[in-house]
């Protein structure tokens, strides 16, 4: 369509992608990658913070989930089944000597259809932690990927 109308062709897609939200990247857009070599810039790799593990004991007062206007996220943060799945990922993070956030970021970054990752941070320490996830990427083998997927599926 772009060529027909002498327009610039798209070169990337921006999709939500994390352990809980995989359908668009892994199924719906897989042909864009395979057929056209589109890139994919993903957002919400930490599932709005759920994959950090900080919601295991409820919604902390200093978190996004406690902010006015973010009430729509509270159901997700208090969903005990999802919180339990995140906690079941903790032994993998412990095995690698990393945080849950670093594990989730490394997992998302490792996917071959992911070109870049949009991260968010409200503290400098979170930015540093995000960068440290780069060292975890090589640890996400096919076996680890399968283990993580089985945990969040179950």
Q: Model-flagged regions — what are they?
A:
Residues 1-152:
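Beta/alpha (TIM)-barrel catalytic core signal, keyed to glycine-rich beta->alpha loops juxtaposed to Asp/Glu
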């Amino acid at each position: 369509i772009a060529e027909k109308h002498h327009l610039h062709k798209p070169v990337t897609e921006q999709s939500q992608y994390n352990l809980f939200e995989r359908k668009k990247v892994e199924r719906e857009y897989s042909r864009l990658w395979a057929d056209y070599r589109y890139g994919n810039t993903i957002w919400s790799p930490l599932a709005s913070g759920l994959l950090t593990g900080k919601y295991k004991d409820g919604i902390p007062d200093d978190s996004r989930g406690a902010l006015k206007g973010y009430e729509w996220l509270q159901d997700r943060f208090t969903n005990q089944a999802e919180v339990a799945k995140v906690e079941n990922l903790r032994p993998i993070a412990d095995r690698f000597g990393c945080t849950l956030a670093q594990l989730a970021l490394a997992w998302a970054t490792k996917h071959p259809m992911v070109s870049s990752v949009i991260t968010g941070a409200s503290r400098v320490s979170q930015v540093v932690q995000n960068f440290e996830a780069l060292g975890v990427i090589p640890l996400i083998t096919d076996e680890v990927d399968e283990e993580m997927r089985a945990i969040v599926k179950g």
